[in-house]
């Protein structure tokens, strides 16, 4: 190799080293930039996860609050309904003696006496109007004449042997019973038949 060629080679070597150094520095910068971006991504992902966890907790709290409010509302409605039913039952119970007195007046009145027939008719109309009015509010008369004795609605005041009726048949109603919205307000007071001693129960 001539001296001139050697000189050219020596002059080119610093240029190549400088280019390599520049490339290395650029690569390092890109790596640092990439690392910073990755760190930022991880930071954002962590923040997102924290936000989602907070949102889930808040959503759970809101749902619990809604459920609690709904339970409070239902309890309040139940208490109001109970209070209303209790007040209505008490009021209805106070009305029963009125119906009883009107019925007794009709039972003891002398229907053959022409002088009091208008009074009897007036009492009868009043009783029917009264019963019609209370039925509009959910009250129902229990008049089990001739029906099978039902201990859930009837109260047996006495029993009497009767060969013509099946045992446990309501022979007479001393006092009518009443229901209010399907609940027993007062049982009917009744006389119940029973099979004669030594006889055959016609229900068997």
Curated annotation (Swiss-Prot):
SUPFAM superfamilies: Coiled-coil domain of nucleotide exchange factor GrpE, Head domain of nucleotide exchange factor GrpE
Recorded GO MF terms: adenyl-nucleotide exchange factor activity; protein homodimerization activity; protein-folding chaperone binding; unfolded protein binding
Database matches in Pfam families: GrpE (PF01025)
Assigned keywords, A-Z: Chaperone, Cytoplasm, Stress response
Location within or outside the cell: Cytoplasm
Compositionally biased spans, kind Basic and acidic residues: 1-12
Subunit structure: Homodimer.
Role played: Participates actively in the response to hyperosmotic and heat shock by preventing the aggregation of stress-denatured proteins, in association with DnaK and GrpE. It is the nucleotide exchange factor for DnaK and may function as a thermosensor. Unfolded proteins bind initially to DnaJ; upon interaction with the DnaJ-bound protein, DnaK hydrolyzes its bound ATP, resulting in the formation of a stable complex. GrpE releases ADP from DnaK; ATP binding to DnaK triggers the release of the substrate protein, thus completing the reaction cycle.
Family: Belongs to the GrpE family.
Stated name of the protein: Protein GrpE
Organism: Pseudoalteromonas atlantica (strain T6c / ATCC BAA-1087)
Encoding gene per record: grpE
């Amino acid at each position: 190799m001539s001296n001139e060629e050697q000189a050219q080679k020596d002059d080119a070597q610093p240029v190549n080293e400088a280019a390599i150094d520049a490339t290395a520095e650029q690569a390092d910068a890109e790596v640092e930039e990439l690392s910073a971006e990755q760190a930022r991504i991880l930071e954002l992902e962590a923040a997102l996860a924290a936000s989602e966890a907070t949102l889930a907790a808040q959503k759970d709290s809101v749902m619990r609050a809604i459920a609690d409010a709904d339970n409070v509302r239902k309890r309040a409605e139940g208490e109001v309904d109970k209070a209303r039913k209790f007040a209505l039952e008490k009021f209805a119970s106070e009305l029963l003696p009125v119906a009883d007195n009107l019925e007794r007046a009709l039972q003891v009145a002398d229907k053959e006496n022409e002088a009091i027939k208008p009074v009897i008719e007036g009492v009868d109309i009043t009783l029917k109007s009264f019963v019609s009015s209370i039925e509009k509010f959910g009250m129902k008369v229990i008049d089990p004449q001739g029906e099978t004795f039902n201990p859930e609605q009837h109260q047996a005041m006495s029993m009497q042997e009767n060969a013509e009726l099946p045992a446990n048949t309501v022979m007479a109603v001393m006092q009518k019973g009443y229901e209010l919205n399907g609940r027993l307000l007062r049982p009917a007071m009744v006389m119940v038949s029973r099979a004669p001693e030594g006889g055959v129960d016609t229900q068997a």
